[in-house]
Swiss-Prot record:
GO molecular function term, any single one: metal ion binding
Keyword Calcium part of the UniProt annotation: no
UniProt-listed Enzyme Commission number(s): 4.2.1.33
CDD domains per record: IPMI
Origin species: Elusimicrobium minutum (strain Pei191)
Gene: leuC
Name this protein carries in UniProt: 3-isopropylmalate dehydratase large subunit
High-level lineage: Bacteria, Pseudomonadati, Elusimicrobiota, Elusimicrobia, Elusimicrobiales
Length: 418
């Protein structure tokens, strides 16, 4: 029987042919936690009596959410991870290295693998043809200790995207539009499998954006076939030998097929307080923006920063719109320095922050004041997400965010991108 990508990868890790809906115990290739979820994982491991990890070299502890830490309680949680790494041989990713999902892609995830992480956006790794999914701290603790996990093979939605984007429109607009169509819980425990000419022509940075936000429709995973672009991405990072072809079988069974014409899309924004509350930029009038944030595991890659720099070059951000730019990793920061992007941002009046999650999680780096509006390239706009339940968060592409920083209100970047 033909299989989806999810069914294939899970079958290869469970010793038998698996179809959607079946429960399996599957081998895990890679596990990850971050400084918000990791301390609980460590606590659960110790409570269960585990003293060794199944694969320390493939167990990664990231300090990225409160990096640098703004208060002692968070600093103490980070000490827990540092000590655990010393005790077990797990890999520690320190403050300034970057966001866990970006670093997993840059350094660790390979096609055909199963990655479980104690963070919702672990699904980012699906862009590399891996079954990457977020789980709770306790589930990840078991995976770290035993090298196995228990899960149900998900049904799959096939997302077919054809056509070319208009100028000023891209992957972020596509995924926001898709979530608006599906709904915030419309794909709960499904895999989203991306297909079509638009996806084939898409660079890896944009595939990561799509995979990253699959969970915002409730999805278990966001999955991609592998191709020469995947191979090149891995080879550039010293993992070319780990490339393998991953694809769904012809005739695989999909619960639903959703077709999108990329050429019909407009710059799209998610409005407070849910990601599926989407509107085109043209539908939003006179929405003043107090803060713009460009970065995160969704849109903090070098390609995203290039877009922002193109718009901000030789200009000044609106004096009433503070602007934060946070590279997703140290490698992205170094590339941005080499290309002169950081100078462009600083001269434009933006603040460039330490690689990491930045203001996204609302513990430091840009907490909103009462009634303030932030336009961010992150993946969530839940009430209180950026540290204040009285704040308002809109989500957009880097192009919309950068141009809005200049104008002081949510604006269409096509006015400047000719």
């Amino acid at each position: 029987m033909p299989q989806t990508i999810a069914e294939k990868i899970i079958s290869n890790h469970s010793g038998r042919r698996v179809k959607a809906g079946e429960f399996v115990i599957a081998d895990v290739d890679l596990t990850a936690v971050q400084d918000g979820t990791g301390p609980l994982t460590v606590e659960e491991l110790k409570k269960a009596g585990f003293t060794k990890l199944a694969n320390p070299a493939r167990t990664i502890l990231f300090i990225d959410h409160a990096a640098p830490s703004p208060r002692k309680e968070l600093s103490n949680s980070q000490v827990v991870l540092r000590n655990f790494a010393k005790e077990t041989g797990a890999i520690l990713s320190e403050i300034g290295e970057g966001v866990c999902h970006q670093l997993l892609a840059e350094k660790y995830v390979n096609p055909g693998e199963i990655l479980i992480g104690a963070d919702s956006h672990t699904c980012t790794g699906g862009a590399l043809g891996a079954f990457a999914t977020g789980m709770g701290s306790t589930d990840v603790a078991v995976g770290m200790a035993l090298g196995k996990t228990w899960l149900k093979a998900p049904q799959t939605f096939k997302i077919e995207v054809e056509g070319a984007f208009k100028k000023g429109v891209g992957a972020k607009d596509l995924i926001l539009h898709l979530i608006g169509v599906i709904g915030a819980d419309g794909a709960t425990y499904k895999a989203l499998e991306f297909h079509g000419s638009t996806i084939r022509n898409m660079e890896m940075a944009d595939r990561f954006t799509l995979a990253n936000m699959a969970v915002e429709a409730g999805a278990k995973a966001g999955l991609f076939f592998t191709d020469e672009k995947t191979r090149a991405y891995l080879a550039e990072r010293g993992r070319g030998d780990n490339f393998k072809l991953i694809s769904a079988d012809e005739g695989a069974d999909y619960e639903k097929v959703i077709k999108i014409d990329a050429s019909s899309l407009e710059p799209t924004v998610s409005c407070p307080h849910t990601v599926d509350n989407t509107k085109t930029v043209g539908e939003l009038k006179d929405i003043k923006v107090n803060q713009v944030f460009i970065g995160t595991c969704t849109n903090g890659r070098i390609e995203d920063l290039r877009i922002a720099a193109e718009i901000l070059k030789d200009k000044k951000v609106n004096p009433g719109t503070r602007t934060f730019i946070t590279p997703a990793s140290r490698d992205v920061m170094l590339a941005a320095l080499k290309e002169g992007l950081i100078e462009i941002f600083v001269k434009a009046g933006a603040s460039v922050q330490t690689p990491g999650c930045g203001p996204c999680v609302g513990v430091h780096g840009g907490i909103l004041g009462d009634g303030e509006v932030c336009l961010a390239t992150q993946n969530r706009n839940f009430q209180g997400r950026m540290g204040n339940t009285k704040g308002f968060i809109y989500l957009s592409s880097p192009a919309v965010a950068a141009y809005s920083a200049l104008k002081g209100y949510i604006s269409d970047p096509r006015e400047i991108l000719k």
